Amino acid sequence: SNLIILNTKKLVRKLYDLLENNYEDKDLYYLTTNLTASDRLKKIGEIKKRLLEGDKICVVSTQLIEAGVDVDFDLVIRSLSGMDSVVQAMGRCNREGHRHSAFTYLINLDKNEEKTSMLKGVDERKTACKAALNKSTDDLDIKKLTEEYFEKLYANLKGDQYSDAV
């Protein structure tokens, strides 16, 4: 089963629409806050059930699936974001530890395609995450990466409009 997490609702919808031709309706799920809270809960319940039954499904979602949703996928693809979101996304892959190997891939989408500039702080978080990842070695040390990320993020935000929040 695959989970794809993107930074904008518009891009989630666009990818979902593209994937519809490759999946049966029952195997492809769309999750964003464009759905009502009730519909989201219903879909998340169905996704959990299908995953527990071992069904192969694909979920295209915004970050809403990252926190507080206990799901376990074989493969996670995450659009570059802040390290906190990346770590949350990684927590949705092989969560139960039943697989010998499982993978989380980070993708850095074109700015013109993703259009995150209107989302407060996302571009700064992406820049800091990319810098921390570029500095890392082949063996990923999540603790070290997270420290690098926050160091880069705070350095980027220093003197910026967000410095009061930091």
Identify the residue ranges that each predicted region occupies.
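Short amphipathic alpha-helical segments, especially helix-boundary/capping motifs
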Residues: E20-Y23, Q63-A67
